[in-house]
Amino acid sequence: MNDVSKASLPKAIFLMGPTASGKTALAIELRKVLPVELISVDSALIYRGMDIGTAKPNADELKAAPHRLLDIRDPSQAYSAADFRRDALAQMAEITAAGRIPLLVGGTMLYFKALLEGLSPLPSADPEVRSRIEQQAAELGWEALHQQLQEIDPVAAARIHPNDPQRLSRALEVFFISGKTLTELTQTSGDALPYQVHQFAIAPASRELLHQRIELRFHQMLASGFEAEVRALFARGDLHTDLPSIRCVGYRQMWSYIEGEISYDEMVYRGVCATRQLAKRQMTWLRGWEGVRWLDSENPDRARKEVLQVVGAIAD
């Protein structure tokens, strides 16, 4: 698409960043001064009843700046990148038709990628192949299967942790079904996003600062009743750690504590570590992201002004 035809497309803003970087606070500030409507891009915020551990915007924040695509699934339900793309496109069209600009804010980079580039033609799940993979895992362990993926698709293996059975089995399943690697297939894009997108990423200047923010926020969540929130989910009886909702960072570790598998101190330690690992993965995505403007989360006023400098002209 040439620059002229691209300029005629409706406008959209991406505000991306690692967990605990101040994305939500900045988005709320921007809504006060720009004709934007917010769309959440977060695979944890979609779940109802999961508010504290996901750092979901509170009632006052949502009153000041409503977020779309929050609380749209029960924790027992699945939600894919394809589901997100469909829902986000519908919301973006509605916002644009009302003469406003969609501002998509969050840290689920796979969702941003699916929205921006379209979805690659991955094969559907095959229960027989998946069962064979799980049987292998039971016999050899997931570490051995990760080594197998390393030989088949080193790029995917570098991105997928050996302790992430869902993503690991999916990467192997894709190869066994199609004969092509996950990396190869994901380089084949679907329909590109029909918007002119201004992309921003917000993060602290150093990893140490981000780690401090993560640890502080995890302790704030605990003080705000995170344990009680997870106990309520646990008491339902229909949720388990194979579900994407309960595998969310923090929830999985608290679940292990409630089940008596680990101590409280170990839960806190693992929860903070898992959140740091999530932030590291998010930063890896962002460093390789094309066309992104970086903002310093330690200077929110300056970050806001930088966005306004770029976006102010398109909002007039």
UniProtKB/Swiss-Prot annotation:
Marked site, Interaction with substrate tRNA, at T108, R130
What are the alphabetically sorted keywords of the record? ATP-binding, Magnesium, Nucleotide-binding, Transferase, tRNA processing
Domain of life, per lineage: Bacteria
Q: EC number(s) per UniProt?
A: 2.5.1.75
Needed cofactors, names only, are: Mg(2+)
Summarizing the function annotation, the protein's role is: Catalyzes the transfer of a dimethylallyl group onto the adenine at position 37 in tRNAs that read codons beginning with uridine, leading to the formation of N6-(dimethylallyl)adenosine (i(6)A).
Indicate what this protein is called per its UniProt record.
tRNA dimethylallyltransferase
- Gene name, Swiss-Prot/TrEMBL: miaA
